[in-house]
């Protein structure tokens, strides 16, 4: 439903950004996504790779909506001096995530698989070879990064992050700067859940992009870095997962 998806996302962000502008909001932070970048990017992915290649077809509608939001913020700043900035987060996880069996992201999907397999004393089958590398950041780190950006990132200052041509960047990547293979991720989750059964890898299923890691050096130059390591974040997320089951608030 790419048309519906694109229409809804464009309406939401345009309404919010335009309303913020018209009502003299002092500063606006727009959140994009790492899917804005071309599917065949060099790694790690720098901000200036935006619009340098073809988008991943499965995420195209979402990516176009996010790119539109970035460019609208840029245009309002340029034409009207509206103070709007944007952050591009890496893959997020944490409390309130989506644990649906077919449309959840890889980390919450693995949490559900291993949790249910432990309770039912069954095996776990994961897609692909497990070799692709991905970056994951806890949502609490993103919250901290957003506050930091609003308080510390001044695009007009002499030390504002710039692209290779010396132009101030209007959006910055935010992440951990570290990636991990899907197989390693699965083993960490299995260990935290204390799953003792067998794990199989269905190599007939696609692996997807081999690596996707954001270059977060520009945001790091401002003095921010992630604080929650992956094992700690997974442990916290497992606690919220169990609590959401008990309180019947789990998104499935």
Give the residues covered by each predicted segment:
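Conserved catalytic-core motifs of eukaryotic protein kinase domains, centered on the activation segment
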Residues: 1-4, 39-44, 96-99
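Glycine-rich "substrate-gating" loop/helix at the edge of Rossmann-like oxidoreductase active sites
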Residues: 58-62, 90-104, 128-140, 176-178
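C-terminal substrate-binding subdomain of Rossmann-fold SDR/epimerase-dehydratase oxidoreductases
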Residues: 116-252
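Active-site loop of short-chain dehydrogenase/reductase
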Residues: 24-28, 40, 81-83, 121-123, ...
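Hydrophobic positions on the long internal alpha-helix
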Residues: 12, 16-20, 72-73, 145, ...
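Conserved Rossmann-fold NAD(P)-dependent oxidoreductase catalytic core, especially the SDR/UDP-sugar
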Residues: 7, 11-59, 85
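Active-site Tyr-X1-5-Lys
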Residues: 17-18, 39, 48, 56-90, ...
